[in-house]
């Protein structure tokens, strides 16, 4: 049966079943038993603060108690009202967890499964129901005293947070011999200390995705992920597979490195998080933990076979029932003999589920929320929110609520987009700092006098995590004895969520028939912990490092005015100065508004900044790093690069190691030798020893690669990622200063247009965030390429060199073994030597995907080798009404005749076949491209729109790159778009797409996306809108000489078509024309197709941007043969007289409610209304009040759309919201009924056949009528009857 989550008020009375007073004996803040509420099954909540400290104190401590950030509030959960809120927040989170199958399964296991009643001190034949890690006392007040009346055996108790409110923790019980039942198979109760309304915030600045496209890239965690992460720990504890806390990766503590101080990354945390971070734990260690758990489970099974008694003896009657519960929990097998055993396959299945499926990383995907992609992410100031308010946080969507338009790009979690997310009081925060001390030399002094220390405090969390080399396991490199009995352990592959959890029927759980025995004896009271304090550390530096440079870019608080400076020292010493690394920006900002031209000045400043941050320097397109971001050096002074002069030149000389503040040199530990021997001098055993050695040799190579990967992930990538985070902060500091300067100048501005330009000024400032997102994509690409280059060029060769030396020694030993036993091996010597020689002939290849199942890492590596953009050798774009090549190869582009360039999106260019429209574009590619080798595999893609076409028109070439009858071309012949490869006049091959030339209006004039891929040794393929249309084999085209000139021109192909006159002018529009020096695959093409659609902007029927204040014919996708008309004031759709013509019916104009009047594009989520003019009278479309009638019956919640005379009053009846609904086959939108504030989506616009009222009479026959379906309209969301198209009247 489904899981039921109980509802409570904190004031509800104790009922001795679901509400009890519990005494855990663990909370040192509790002077008496605490009120507890059963959420479901074995899961309980105590809405009180929790501490294990011997002397607990909830006040902000005088010194830091953790390397992590801390938030303290002694008043939190101090009142019954606070406790009631906390209780209801936990209940709501459990309901949200329970809304997905994986969450339901998680709750089910925690609420029904039980720890083993006992531990390794318990006699093997006994169930002990009174163990201290399992039993919690139930107490009742009798007079002035609390009396124990029983006990319960929960699996999880959730309490309020510990002293540090933002540091959730899951704890369990330690046994007297310093072992944990939670780690030894038995399982144990977990106490989770958490605060659901305080959330950590992170940056997704290192991700090349669109989340930051319209705002800053900072987001808060969904509170269910915080809770579910801790529930993962609780489940590991419950199943007895918890990883010991001493299994960690520590941060480097040396003053040589800028690394987080005293941070220990626990393996247990990595397991609970999952995802890419799991690769920080070597597979050998993961296998060790799994095998250890298997041994413990075998011990548990052995105990179950021996159980004969229970403590207390009154529970002997429950022995059989508890055995069955434990057999089910551990997935043990009961043999025909009755013996309980462990089936290894069932154990592996269970272990994989617990460690690879139930992870924070997977939860984020399944609940569709934004989350950190790796465990080690940049942390920002925490936020709080009222998650009990369904308008802020609901069970289905969390913060990303569709009705508030916060579901797009996870805006509900975005700190700059959701006002409900409030930063906590900074006065209550506490940080561990590193104090940098820079002692400069006074060059003016004759004796080079050292100046006083220039101090800078940097938060510990702002430093990168650099793993200590001593924690990267090296035991795999120890000397190893090889004989005929040596075994090789192979590590299992990762498993997927789909394979395990989501295939289960989690709704059929059965009744929660849990036992809660009453026990009279007292549990042991365990001692509390002592509070540990940390001291800030001081680190001397010999130059102003990146942290000083970032500090110099921050705008000081309460500064009335400021100027930009190029001197970091000046900015550090003067609060009215801000350092910038863009000289022209400094000049323009500091000049201020000249001659009252405020808007021109602001535009110039923003354009200068955005131009600078989008700069890339290309040294060599064939190199590993495709483009350098030149301003990273002066922005962060990485490795004192500013002192070295030009950063790009320094990078070219030094390479990627210039970016690493620490650990620029990589060394592999000494590889222990193989000691080869055979105990018995027998032929088969010697041969087996040789085989085992060859297998161990392969394992040694793979182990070395794995060690290298662990080192790269924990010590190198973290440093590279830190540069991305720092650059994100730097760009935002620069943009923040620009915004502040614009505000200051606007405040002083007194022009008559001040109010009119206010919205333009705001749009200018907002555009800075958009450009920062674009710049971060460039920076992240550069950083990723550098990190991968370091792996392949700095690390991998050294590992292979060491392994080759190891191979030479091992091979010599094996040959010696064969020679020294040549008599025993008679007849086999030459064969064995050949086997050894062949085995050592080649190195073991490094396939990175053999060492990780990390999809994010795979994407990075694939980008390194096969990045789509990197393979562009031509990118023809319209930039500021000029056609240019933006690929980096700088092809020459010229225009002849009348080529019309569109100055607004989609920035296309138009070609015509005759008259004034005739023109051509000529592209001459760079001489440095070696065409014949480049085009062994190549692809071409472009968007094209062609006006109406008929089959008897002549054929036309539209794009031509043929010279001396050799090359390629694209044309239109009859109803086909044709791509042709031509070797000579007699040898060519073509592939085509049948273009719709039907007589129906829908069959022409639309934008569509064409991709042709060519593999000269394989196939030619054509894709339309990302879909594969046709594949043909490339045959006998081995000598194509490709031209460097590409001409875009409509030229008639002789002897084609029936019409020979030039009077029928053909027009077409082209945009985003690319050539790639590779064969794109289907995934590449889909990425390209989706990235070029700009899906947030609503499209008209042809695929152009839908515009405000422009006339359109409105059509329904299900009834394209109908046009919009009015019968009295009721809108109806009549049958067209000519299916080939959209120009029939009434025209509508889309009007905006509010927003930027300079941007005429209609965007998804816009609130708008529709104007219509009929016989010179103005109307609005509006929703009528009467419901529709069908078959003489009222149709519930369906209302007609009619006409209302236009007035100045804009009321809710005429207001709608629009969302794009584009797909492979057409461009359309969905229209929803909304209100003036856009806060309420009450219905969806559809179409259907109804009768409607006119005056007091009903029409006798039915009409096709547009309607609004209110109430439950979810079923219509997928219906094409709700898809509306807008055909421009002018086209």
Swiss-Prot record:
Binding sites annotated in the UniProt record for Zn(2+): 229, 233, 269
Spans annotated as Translocation domain (TD): 450-865
Active-site positions on this chain: 230
Record region (Belt): 490-541
Annotated positions binding a ganglioside GD1a (d18:1(4E)): 1119, 1247-1250, 1281
Leader sequence segment: none
EC number: 3.4.24.69
Region (N-terminus of receptor binding domain (N-RBD)), start-end ranges: 866-1093
Region C-terminus of receptor binding domain (C-RBD), annotated ranges: 1094-1291
Protein name: Botulinum neurotoxin type C
GO CC terms: extracellular region
Host ganglioside-binding motif (motif): residue ranges: 1256-1258
Annotated positions binding a ganglioside GD1b (d18:1(4E)): 1126-1129, 1146
Pfam families, A to Z: Peptidase_M27, Toxin_R_bind_C, Toxin_R_bind_N, Toxin_trans
UniProt remark on cofactor binding: Binds 2 zinc ions per subunit. The catalytic Zn(2+) is bound by LC, the other Zn(2+) must bind to another region.
GO biological process: membrane protein proteolysis; negative regulation of calcium ion-dependent exocytosis; symbiont-mediated suppression of host neurotransmitter secretion
Other comment: There are seven antigenically distinct forms of botulinum neurotoxin: Types A, B, C, D, E, F, and G; new subtypes are quite frequent. Types C and D can undergo domain swapping to create hybrid types.
Cystine residue pairs: 437-453
Record note on what altering residue 1258 to A does: Receptor-binding domain (RBD) has greatly reduced binding of ganglioside GD1b, no longer binds neurons
MF GO annotations: ganglioside binding; metalloendopeptidase activity; protein transmembrane transporter activity; toxin activity; zinc ion binding
InterPro entries reported in the protein's UniProt record: Bot/tetX_LC (IPR000395), Clostridium_toxin_transloc (IPR036248), ConA-like_dom_sf (IPR013320), Kunitz_inhibitor_STI-like_sf (IPR011065), Toxin_rcpt-bd_C (IPR013104), Toxin_rcpt-bd_N (IPR012928), Toxin_trans (IPR012500)
Obligatory cofactor(s): Zn(2+)
Family to which the UniProt record says this protein belongs: Belongs to the peptidase M27 family.
Catalysed reactions listed for this entry: Limited hydrolysis of proteins of the neuroexocytosis apparatus, synaptobrevins, SNAP25 or syntaxin. No detected action on small molecule substrates
């Amino acid at each position: 049966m489904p899981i039921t989550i109980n509802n409570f008020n904190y004031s509800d009375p104790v009922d001795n079943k679901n509400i009890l007073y519990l005494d855990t004996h663990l909370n040192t803040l509790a002077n008496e038993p605490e009120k507890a509420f059963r959420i479901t099954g074995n899961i309980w909540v105590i809405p009180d603060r929790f501490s294990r400290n011997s002397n607990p104190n909830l006040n902000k401590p005088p010194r830091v108690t953790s390397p992590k950030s801390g938030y303290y509030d002694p008043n939190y959960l101090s009142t019954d009202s606070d406790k009631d809120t906390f209780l209801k927040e936990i209940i709501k989170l459990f309901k949200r967890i329970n809304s997905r199958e994986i969450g339901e399964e998680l709750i089910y296991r925690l609420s029904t499964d039980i720890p083993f009643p006992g531990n390794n001190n318990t006699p093997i034949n006994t169930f002990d129901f009174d163990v201290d890690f399992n039993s919690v006392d139930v107490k009742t007040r009798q007079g002035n005293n609390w009396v124990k009346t029983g006990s319960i055996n929960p699996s999880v108790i959730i309490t309020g947070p510990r002293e540090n409110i933002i540091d959730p923790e899951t704890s369990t019980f330690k046994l007297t011999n310093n072992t944990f039942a939670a780690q030894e198979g038995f399982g144990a109760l977990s106490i989770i200390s958490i605060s659901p309304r305080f959330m950590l915030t992170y940056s997704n600045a290192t991700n090349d995705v669109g989340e930051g496209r319209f705002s800053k890239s900072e987001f808060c965690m969904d509170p269910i992920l915080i809770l579910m992460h801790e529930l993962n720990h609780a489940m590991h504890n419950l199943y007895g597979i918890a990883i010991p806390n001493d299994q960690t990766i520590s941060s480097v503590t040396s003053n040589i490195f800028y690394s987080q101080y005293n941070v220990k990354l626990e393996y247990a945390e990595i397991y609970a998080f999952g995802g890419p971070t799991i690769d920080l734990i070597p597979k050998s260690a993961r296998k060790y933990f799994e095998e250890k758990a298997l041994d413990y489970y075998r011990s548990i099974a052995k105990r179950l076979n021996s159980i004969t008694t229970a403590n207390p003896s009154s529970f002997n009657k429950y022995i059989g029932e508890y055995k069955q519960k434990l057999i089910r929990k551990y997935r043990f097998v009961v043999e025909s003999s009755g013996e309980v055993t462990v089936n290894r396959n069932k154990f592996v299945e269970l272990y994989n589920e617990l460690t690879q499926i139930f992870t924070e990383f997977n939860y984020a995907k399944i609940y569709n929320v934004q989350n950190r992609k790796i465990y080690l992410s940049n942390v920002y100031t925490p936020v709080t929110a009222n998650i009990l308010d369904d308008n802020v946080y609901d069970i289905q969507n969390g913060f990303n609520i569709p009705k508030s338009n916060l579901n797009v790009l996870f805006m509900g979690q975005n700190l700059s987009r959701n006002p409900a997310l409030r930063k906590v009081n900074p006065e209550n925060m506490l940080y561990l700092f590193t104090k940098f001390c820079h002692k400069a030399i006074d060059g003016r002094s004759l004796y080079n006098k050292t100046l006083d220390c220039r101090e800078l405090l940097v938060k510990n969390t702002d430093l990168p995590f650099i793993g200590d080399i001593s924690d990267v396991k090296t035991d795999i490199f120890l000397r190893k004895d090889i004989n005929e009995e040596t075994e090789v352990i192979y590590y299992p592959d990762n498993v997927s969520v789909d394979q395990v959890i989501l295939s289960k029927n989690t709704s059929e759980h059965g009744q929660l028939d849990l036992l809660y025995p009453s026990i009279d004896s007292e549990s042991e009271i365990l001692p509390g912990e002592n509070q540990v304090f940390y001291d800030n550390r001081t680190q001397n530096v010999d130059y102003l490092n990146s942290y000083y440079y970032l500090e110099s870019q921050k705008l000081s608080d309460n500064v009335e005015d400021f100027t930009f400076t190029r001197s970091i020292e000046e900015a550090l010493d003067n609060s009215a100065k801000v350092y910038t690394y863009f000289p022209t920006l400094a000049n323009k900002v500091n000049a201020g508004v000249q001659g009252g031209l405020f808007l021109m000045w602001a535009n110039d400043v923003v354009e200068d900044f955005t131009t600078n941050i989008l700069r890339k320097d290309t040294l060599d397109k064939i190199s590993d790093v495709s483009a350098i971001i030149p301003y990273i050096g002066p922005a962060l002074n990485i490795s004192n690069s500013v002192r070295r002069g030009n950063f790009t030149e320094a990078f070219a000389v030094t390479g990627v190691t210039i970016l690493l503040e620490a650990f620029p040199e990589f060394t592999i530990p000494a590889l222990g030798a193989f000691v080869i021997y055979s105990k018995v001098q027998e032929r088969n055993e010697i041969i087996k020893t040789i085989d085992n050695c060859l297998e161990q040799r392969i394992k040694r190579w793979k182990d070395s690669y794995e060690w290298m990967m662990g080192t790269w992930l924990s010590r190198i990538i973290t440093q590279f990622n830190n540069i991305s985070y720092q650059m994100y902060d730097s760009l935002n500091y620069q943009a923040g200063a620009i915004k502040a300067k614009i505000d200051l100048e606007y405040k002083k501005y007194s022009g008559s247009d001040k109010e009119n330009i206010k919205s333009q000024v705001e749009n200018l400032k907002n555009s800075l965030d958009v450009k920062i997102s674009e710049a971060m994509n460039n920076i992240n690409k550069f950083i990723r390429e550098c990190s991968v280059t370091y792996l392949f060029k700095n690390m991998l060769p050294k590992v292979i060199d060491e392994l080759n030396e190891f191979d030479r020694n091992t091979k010599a030993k094996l040959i010696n073994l064969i020679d020294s036993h040549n008599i025993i091996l008679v007849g086999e010597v030459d064969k064995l030597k050949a086997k050894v020689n062949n085995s050592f002939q080649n190195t073991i290849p490094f396939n990175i995907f053999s060492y990780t199942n990390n999809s994010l890492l795979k994407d990075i590596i694939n980008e390194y080798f096969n990045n789509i953009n990197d393979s562009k050798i031509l990118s023809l774009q319209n930039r500021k009404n000029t056609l240019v090549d933006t690929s980096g190869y700088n092809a020459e582009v010229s225009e002849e005749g009348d080529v019309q360039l569109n100055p607004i999106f989609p920035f296309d260019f138009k070609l015509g076949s005759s008259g004034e429209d005739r023109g051509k574009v000529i592209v001459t590619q760079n001489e440095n491209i070696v065409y014949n080798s480049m085009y062994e595999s190549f692809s071409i893609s472009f968007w094209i729109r062609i006006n109406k076409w008929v089959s008897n028109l002549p054929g036309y070439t539209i794009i031509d790159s043929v010279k001396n009858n050799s090359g390629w071309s694209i044309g239109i012949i009859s109803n086909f778009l044709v791509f042709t490869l031509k070797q000579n006049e007699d040898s060519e091959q073509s592939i085509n797409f049948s273009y719709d030339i039907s007589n129906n209006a829908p069959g022409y004039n639309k934008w569509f996306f064409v991709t042709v891929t060519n593999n000269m040794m394989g196939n030619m393929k054509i894709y339309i809108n990302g879909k594969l249309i046709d594949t043909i084999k490339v045959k006998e085209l081995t000598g194509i000489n490709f031209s460097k000139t590409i001409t875009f021109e409509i030229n008639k192909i002789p002897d084609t078509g029936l019409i020979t006159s030039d009077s029928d002018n053909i027009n077409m529009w082209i945009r985003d024309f690319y050539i790639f020096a590779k064969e794109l695959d289907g995934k590449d093409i889909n990425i390209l197709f989706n990235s070029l659609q700009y899906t947030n902007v609503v499209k008209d029927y042809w695929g152009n941007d839908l515009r405000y204040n422009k006339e359109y014919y409105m059509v329904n996708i299900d009834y394209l043969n109908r046009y919009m008309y009015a019968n009295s004031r009721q809108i109806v759709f009549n049958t067209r007289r000519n299916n080939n013509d959209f120009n029939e019916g009434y025209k509508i104009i889309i009007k905006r409610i509010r927003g930027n009047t300079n941007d005429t594009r209609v965007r998804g989520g816009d609130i708008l209304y529709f104007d219509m003019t009929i016989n010179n009278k103005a109307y609005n479309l509006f929703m009528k009040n009467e419901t529709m009638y069908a078959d003489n019956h009222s149709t519930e919640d369906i209302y007609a759309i009619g006409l209302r005379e236009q007035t100045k009053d804009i009321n809710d009846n005429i207001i709608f919201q629009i969302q794009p609904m584009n797909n492979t086959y057409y461009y359309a939108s969905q229209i929803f009924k909304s209100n003036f504030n856009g806060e309420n989506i009450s219905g969806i616009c559809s179409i259907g056949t109804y009768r409607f009222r006119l005056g007091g009479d009903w029409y006798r026959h039915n009409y096709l009528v547009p309607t609004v379906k209110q109430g439950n309209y979810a079923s219509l969301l997928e219906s094409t009857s709700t898809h509306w198209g807008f055909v421009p009247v002018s086209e």
